[in-house]
UniProtKB/Swiss-Prot annotation:
Name of the protein in its database record: Extracellular metalloproteinase 2
Signal peptide start-end: 1-19
Catalytic residues (UniProt): E430
Organism of derivation: Arthroderma otae (strain ATCC MYA-4605 / CBS 113480)
Keyword tags: Glycoprotein, Hydrolase, Metal-binding, Metalloprotease, Protease, Secreted, Signal, Virulence, Zinc, Zymogen
Family indicated by similarity: Belongs to the peptidase M36 family.
Region listing for Disordered, in residue ranges: 294-313
Amino acid sequence: MHGLLLAGLAVALPLGVAGHPARPQTALSPRGIDVNAYRFTSTAKYNEHKTTSQMVQSFAYSKDDDYVATATKLVKSTFPNMTFRTVKDHYIGTNGIGHVHFKQTAHDIDIDNADFNVNIGRDGKVFTFGNSFYQGEMPKTNPMVKRDYSDPVKALHGAIKTLKIPVKPESAKAMPMDEVETFKFEGTSGALSEPKAKLVYIQKDGNLHLTWRVETDVGDNWLLSYVDSKESETVHNVVDYVASADYKVFAFGLNDPTEGQPSMIKDPWNTTGSGSPFTWHGDGKTDYTVTRGNNVAAQDNPSGGSQWENNYRPDSPQLSFVYDYSDQMEPEDYKDFAITQLFYTTNTFHDVLYSLGFTEEAGNFQVNNGNKGGKGNDFAICNAQDGSGTNNANFATPPDGQPGRMRMYTWTTSKPKRDGDLEAGIVIHEYTHGLSNRLCGGPANSNCLNDLEAGGMGEGWGDFYATAIRLKQGDTHDTDYTMGEWAANQKGGIREYPYSTNMQTNPYTYADVKGMREVHGIGTVWATILYDVLWNLIDDHGMGKNVMPKMVDGVPTDGRTLAMKLVLDGMTLMPCNPNFMQARDAIIDADMALTKGANKCSLMKAFAKRGLGSNTKPGKGYTNNFDMPSGC
């Protein structure tokens, strides 16, 4: 779950669509489910480029193999006695790296948290790879032969009872779907879509456990609950997909109403690259006169309900979305302006990310992919002034082919209330959950930021992109930024420290992760490190006036968009459920792929400054190391 919890307020805050907290932090959902208690523990290993180059020197390449075949050969040679399947989400990124993902199996049943990702370079050779394959003893018999497991309906009842999921299963019937031992449940009520169950193994505590993976979408939580196949009230683990024309808007780069005034912007898709070929108001089949198109459907949702398609949207046959806003107005009195702002911010960010490599093949959010790969029919459903909560926001990211869902709330921390739709940093943070969940582990797997440390980096990436985009001309290495300060009406923002390169202003280092038990605190450490990365690259390459990247041979020409590109490319390289060290190495490897390592020393200088030096030790010790690699 992803959202925005804040700190130090004398109000009752919703605790679980995980707000973007800062100080006192909790992992409880609105119903009291402690999702942190059910997180998977990552077993991922990542082989960065230098190590991979040495390891695969003897690997047998064939000039006749395509990148998928080469990746498959590597998996077979690494684990010759294991079975696996190729996940159908492979693609070649804009940096020329091919990405292929594999899922380990046992008796043709998926081991749901056992993954192998292979990244193939432009030369056709293995660039990097990572895996979390299970290497223990395999089950000797196929459980499907004697059906040695409970009925899936019992698993549904068990998940609902144990986790207090607000779904009524009394009349549930399991109806077979196309995949083996996969069912949907008819006759339930309370979920936004029919619950599903699939028989899968999971690895836990060094052993395999046969489970029913029960999927329930109830809005604030979209859960995958791994229920023991025999003891239906035993839930081993849980994954949550939720992370908490003419337009008169605050222009992209203005974070909130304190930074400027609304202005008129005409046909913005003409200046945001090739990400929106149908404009923002069409999907190749239908042209809309409301705030709906190929990338985004933005509407109000005052009831907080699950319906969105027929909800209110501003409508202008002339595509003139010009509405009034004043900081003296209550949010419901400027809902047209708020919906338009949300539509503008999310579409612009979609186009920025598209130019950086979050394309159709990579799993982006679009209805019509235009025969460019990936799965369509999955734009972002964005609810403005959603009535299901306050002082918060969240984004749900199912796998590619299913729409993402953003819920933006009003904030009751000032009079009049404030609307999170008007703070671009919150919107960008939420949308970035969609980016990171689609890229890490591949677009078909949204379970790869479930480990506590990995989930923390998911929060940190959101803050990083929100902060990078709000930088202004004239900012320097000494400029500090906060998160959520305007919406929360809280000086200093909703994080423990502002983002700063000054160690006195923000003293966070890698060692501070030790002892943290909540993703937002961990995320603040990660975003702090990336803020130093950002400014080292800006100091080296400058910062363009426009956040839309200018490219030369696929490489951004300024430091800000180069940092955004390297962080994005790093997500595509790292293994499922990565840790800080693996994410650091993946960013270094992304630079190797993009610039042949031209920025390695500047990157490592930032990492080492915050304790992630070249001799940092793996494991959960979280001991700082400030060493630079040889050659820097």
